[in-house]
Amino acid sequence: MAPSGDSNVKEHNNQVSYKKAINTKTDLILQNKKHANDIFDVIEYLQSEKEKEIIFATNACSKIFCELIERGDLFVGELPKEEDLAQGDRSAEEKYHIFMRHRYNSCVELMLENVSHESFQVKETSLCAVMKFVATEGKHPLQNLDWSEHYNFPRELIQALVEHLLSEKEDMSLLISRFQEFMEKDDVRYYVMSSVRYSTATVMERNKKAVIPVFQNNVFNLLTTINIPNQASEMTNFLVQQQSKHDDWKAAKLKEHKRAFEQMWLLFLRYKLPGSMYKKILVILHESILPQMSDPKLMMDFLSAAYDIGGAISLSALNGLFVPIHEHNLDYPDFYKKLYNLLDPSIFHVKYRARFFHLANIFLSSTHLPVYLVAAFVKRLARLSLTAPPTALLILLPFICNLIRRHPSCRVLIHRPSAADEPCDDPYVMEEEDPAQCHALESSLWEIKTLQNHHHPDVSKAATMINEPLSAQEEDISELLELTTFELMERELKGEKKTVPLEFDMATDLLKSSREVLGVHFTLE
């Protein structure tokens, strides 16, 4: 037990030692310029292998340089090289300012490197320290101001921070969520959006537009933390308070924020994305992205690319296309053709089956759709019903009947004479991708007639609906969308039977059935 106690004491002494050393040097640096060289020792702790030493030194450096910036003790303007200090005729004061400015730059570089440290506490401390520098530099600029702009903001520092947050090798989602607090500041948000746009273009072009999953996931996480205010009057929260209000400051204009937001997203979506990311973007598309777009048409290329991926992503992409088409009267002639081609046997066996039929019901709800188009959907669904499981059929049959109710011209598919009774060739072409060329209106719903002999009583009962005139009131299929085979079996097992069948065939006469062995060999006279 003794060695353990000695170890704890030694560790405690080490902690006291480095804290005392850093605090002492911090006080000396701030009290007297002759101790300027002590800054090297404090900065060196930023490269320590011990997490606690880095955190303590980071806070010390933040205190030192924020105070020096506020005092005006750092060189302002284009920084001369340190090698040139001995050559020029500069005062001791000016040399001190240049020296400390170089040390400040070194400190910032190390803090930015620590944003990618393996310890989250180090990352968070470094992030907060850099943002303190952003706020301090905003109030006391280290660059000569361009007075044509009349405002100041350390854009280069924000750009450097964003580049480290958008790592190509490390998932930074946790730190980005911490950074969201700073994104509530209107000026920070604006310059971050500009920086994201620049960093995304630089990295993607450098990698020849190839998919970079980690980097693109970091960009997506940062983009989703950005919330644009609804009204210009809400934009009053700034990290850097300007000396006076300026109408030409873009960071203070809601219109400029929306423009930067739009440009940032469009640039990000221009490149090929990891397959899983399309679904994430499509989920937030309507609530978070489209409302800030000046023209919904700008998203058409992305949505078309998402459709080509297939599966649930294709369906979500069509949903994304439907809103601009429906609400903004945008023309997209291939929309229903693409929806039509999503109808295949696999649709009954995927997890998103309920969502598919829910959205398909919305897409086909308009009574102004051409009759040939609705007939094509009705016929394709009818053909697919021949191989569909009972749970899917209980959705399909009411769905088909609802389509016919909305479009009475499609009743010709039901009432085509003798189509189900006489052998004939079905003119409908199942393999045709264009609903206008599949000849659905020339066919009939013989498939539904066939399902009237289905082994499941609920299915056969639902199929007999087309034998009677359809009511004007549509059936509610919402409760059927999530129906499972287990629920169907439970329903059958719990149901009360009025009669119990004793034979496969109903007995009518004694010993007269040709299927009974006794009836074949014996006859009653």
Curated annotation (Swiss-Prot):
Family: Belongs to the CBF/MAK21 family.
Transmembrane segments: 305-325, 356-376, 384-404
Source organism, top-level taxon: Eukaryota
Main localisation: nucleus
Gene name tied to this protein: noc4l
Protein location: Nucleus membrane; Nucleus, Nucleolus
Protein name listed in UniProt: Nucleolar complex protein 4 homolog
Cross-referenced InterPro entries: CCAAT-binding_factor, Noc4
Presence of keyword GTP-binding: no
Alphabetical UniProt keywords: Membrane, Nucleus, Transmembrane, Transmembrane helix
Mode of membrane association: Multi-pass membrane protein
GO biological process: ribosome biogenesis
Cellular component aspect of the GO annotation: Noc4p-Nop14p complex; nuclear membrane; nucleolus; small-subunit processome
